């Protein structure tokens, strides 16, 4: 298969360092014991957030303390080096254990855990490299620890359903944790607002018959795996056991195995289903897809990634909240898939600096391990999807995570059939 090894494709400007140094910290003017960390004033302009209300102080909430990492500048330089085809170190990736020994911060980790225990919080999980410490406690505890107030935000989905998220509008951290904590997740960041459905037009086309995809390079009106292989000069569609790959599945997206089998029969290839289903979003038939969900991107991504790399072990990895959270989970595996495909995104201005920073750091660590993250650049160009039908919202609005400098951002190819 075509093994993608380019890790750096786009550039972006953010107010804080992608590698972990936060230059915006200042003393919290409301407290002599805390340091201001982050806020999201943009929440007030999100049209999908329709209500904000207070919640009971004994309600238990889970947050993630992100521990400051060491030697991230050096690790970033290594990423550039091993990703450069002209470098003598090209392709000489590091193991997860080597990266952990280089970046982990045991002193900071111990300080955070001790503080949480003393505050009455319960540590429920730690990542393999101790960078992420998950803890739960009543809201009253977090409001004291983070010098903030939490609310229940209601988020309206595209289908009209309402999801609730417990978040604050800003937060600070205690002075004694200032040198040890990069940020705290599940505080201000919200799930990306999914784009509306792409604009489409129905065109009457005859349905291809079994094996027709393979019988000719093009079939008028259809972008098939043979078309892609021909256009990009791919010799064949055979992958290998070592070329592992994974598809990110959004929280409302399902993969339908019957559809995948039908698609593969059109290409006249042996049925090849994903080997691993993480979080249970693969169903046999479309009738099993829950109300309010669909099987659009999940089907499309899986059909075509297997269509150009048949036989490569494939994982369908669904995730319910943030893309940064998903990447944390991937990076916390001993043997992550070597190619990660993401066809989702949202307006970057609604991504907190901390979430962008964490995503970048995970992408750097995965890149040094030889993992390529391929992200669709979006359907609407520079103006982003909110300008559909509303020219007043035209402007330059980057799409995250395609805007991240440590992913391979992929646009569309216009093919005349």
Over which residues does each language-model region extend?
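Cleavable N-terminal signal peptides of Sec/SRP-targeted secreted and luminal proteins
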Residues: 3-17
């Amino acid at each position: 298969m075509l093994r993608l090894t380019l890790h750096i494709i786009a550039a972006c400007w953010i107010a804080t360092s992608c590698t972990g140094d936060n230059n915006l910290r200042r003393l919290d003017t409301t407290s002599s014991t805390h340091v201001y960390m982050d806020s999201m004033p943009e929440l007030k302009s999100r049209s999908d957030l329709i209500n904000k209300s207070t919640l009971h102080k004994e309600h238990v909430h889970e947050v993630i303390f992100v521990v400051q990492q060491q030697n991230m500048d050096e690790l970033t330089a290594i990423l550039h080096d091993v990703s450069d085809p002209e470098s003598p170190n090209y392709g000489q990736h590091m193991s997860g254990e080597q990266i952990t020994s280089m970046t982990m911060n045991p002193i900071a980790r111990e300080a955070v855990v001790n503080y949480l225990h003393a505050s009455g919080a319960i540590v429920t999980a730690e990542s393999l490299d101790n960078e992420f410490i998950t803890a739960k406690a009543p809201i009253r505890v977090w409001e004291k620890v983070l010098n903030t107030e939490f609310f229940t935000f209601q988020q309206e989905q595209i289908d009209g359903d309402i999801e609730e998220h417990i978040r604050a509008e800003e937060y600070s951290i205690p002075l004694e944790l200032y040198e040890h904590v990069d940020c705290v997740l599940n505080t201000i960041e919200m799930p990306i607002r999914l784009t509306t459905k792409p604009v489409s037009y129905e065109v009457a086309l005859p349905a291809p018959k079994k094996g027709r995809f393979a019988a000719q390079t093009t079939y008028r009106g259809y972008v098939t795996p043979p078309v892609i292989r021909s256009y990009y000069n791919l010799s064949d569609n055979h992958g290998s056991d070592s070329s592992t790959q994974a598809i990110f599945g959004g929280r409302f997206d399902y993969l339908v195995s019957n559809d995948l089998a039908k698609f593969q029969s059109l290409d006249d290839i042996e049925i090849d289903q994903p080997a691993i289903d993480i979080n249970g979003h693969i169903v046999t038939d479309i009738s099993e897809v829950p109300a309010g969900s669909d099987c659009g991107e999940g089907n499309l991504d899986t059909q075509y990634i297997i269509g150009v790399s048949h036989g490569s072990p494939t994982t369908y990895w669904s995730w319910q909240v943030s893309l940064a959270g998903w990447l944390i989970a991937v990076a916390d595996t001993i043997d992550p898939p070597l190619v990660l495909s993401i066809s989702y995104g949202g307006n970057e201005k609604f991504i907190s600096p901390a979430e962008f920073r964490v995503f970048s750091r995970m992408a750097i660590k995965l890149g040094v391990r030889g993992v390529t993250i391929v992200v669709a650049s979006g359907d609407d160009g520079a103006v982003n999807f909110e300008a559909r039908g509303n020219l007043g919202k035209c402007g330059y609005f980057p799409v995250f995570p395609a805007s991240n400098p440590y992913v391979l951002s992929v646009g569309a190819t216009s093919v005349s059939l």
